[in-house]
């Protein structure tokens, strides 16, 4: 975190908290008692925040003790803001907000990704209907602006970017991580006159690479 931010790039600590299994992580309800939560699931975040002060932290998809993390008052306000005195920007995971009004009221600052004009009109309407207090919305906006200003200030930090060096390194990593199969018993090339059964979903929809943040452009 310190290394990244020393170069003017915001570090984002994630996924807060108890996102410790991938199966059903969008909806799973992690039931964790206070001692286990403190000693196992929160300790790493606490150390990182107190020692490195990341500019942002990302809330998890899952629920913790019945409340979605993006609208979990205990996690956001009691732990992050009050107990750990965290001053950075609190953002959602990608599409991780289930109720934007509840999320804003419980301290979420930024929902990812951005949406169309109707989305912002809904927030405006919630303010007009007193479902969101204007001062609470102001607090969220302030945290986002502070993050933007940190980025603007970081642009003054001198840097060098050797694109070709990065390309060469990526190529070297790909070459060194490739697996060469041994053609035992002359299995390949196969007999074109035989039928070969390929079983499973990936036979129809092969996953060459994952989506989202792990997707790369082979060019």
PLM features per residue range, with description:
Residues 1-219:
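Glycoside hydrolase catalytic-domain context in secreted enzymes
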